[in-house]
């Protein structure tokens, strides 16, 4: 008995020394790598101590110490995301508790074991230690996204929250009286309960966003909890997402604003706000949100909620559900910069768009750009980015810079172009003569379209420079590439992208038609500038067939007819053109495959004057 008492005191002292050192290191070590190394050491030391304690048969006198060491060990396991190890140890501990009480476990189901263990220690000094372990089991379930287990144990969780304060206060009073005999815990269970409560509310809220007002009420209640500001911000963020699902976008924006007021580093709130502005078609507000989001993403990483002072467990350990991760995900800084550039160009802020594109290309070329390697895969392919940037430069009246980017595209793709591309249907792309569809064959059309688009943009550049001969040459190069694509007519509309499983292939076919229409229109307009009117009329007519929505082709077709003294036909053509609205730039197709109105323009007032002089048609 004397030896047993000596062992108990020795083991208690060892636990207290380890716990004190662990708590001190947790507060003083800011380096995550060093912190992880120390956590591994502490969990190993606690586990060694636990094996010594469990090396002799379980006894009630040593149970309090054993449960404390189990708690400390499991906290260290959990801090290292070793949830399986923590759960196994917790299950074994619940079984040993029942052995001490003289009850046969009868099952390994954690819920049954914990209910039986709680019942066996009710009214005893071990009750608060078992409650502490139950906290950790709760955390493990939450970390492993086993929300059904948490929900099934809701009654016990409520009891835990209600009783823990009084029980642990009694424990602290007892600890002050017999500090050397009471095992120290590395983490105050009350802090753990507070952390788990709000993390549970956040995870459950993310899983139940579509349930409406009931979820919203729970999230609003959680927002009043004592918790780190980052977690409170998440409750506001989820409230906003819930309201967005309920088709209340303006109320959702208010919640996102609360999230940012609570924690200015909550970048996902900016991103969700941008999505709401896009839904509301408020392009200027969306651009502003994207600009701020990009600036924040360039700062050191602040996407994870910070640990509270003195807390060994990061909230991110318990926020691992797929639904929540999806809601909290934010595109990379480069992806946001690309979206910002495209939005600016499409919505008339061309100079800003150009600067964004140039910044993006510079970042992609810089080996030292933060996060660039992780972000590249989420961006369009580099030739497409060059073409988008080239289109923006063309709109900004910078033809020389546009041509330089197009030369880069042509140089990187020209030697890889197939001799011919045969498309059997919108979902099938193959090079003529090949026996099977290969990745190379599927990419053949894409590379051909990139090269053709580069020649098209260069034709536009020479048109801006009024070098009509070079413009005709480059438009012809574009057309010569496009006629290499052969396809069977299956009734598929090539004017707008389709929305089926082959949408990407459908977009490529739509781009093909647009490039045909635009290059024929460009060459026809260039022919008109050098008075080759018959050739101009032919190309403009073909352009109208390939791209009926083209405004420039229709207007210049009328102009050429007028010059050929077919004035009645010209008047009818212009009247039809004015009766149709001028389409604006769209995100449905690449910007370089849309009408940029960068070439010579016809004055509408002069055309109307001609019609008036002609008289009634």
Regions found by a protein language model. Give the residues of each.
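Non-TPR docking regions that flank or precede TPR/alpha-solenoid scaffolds in eukaryotic proteins
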Residues: 1-617
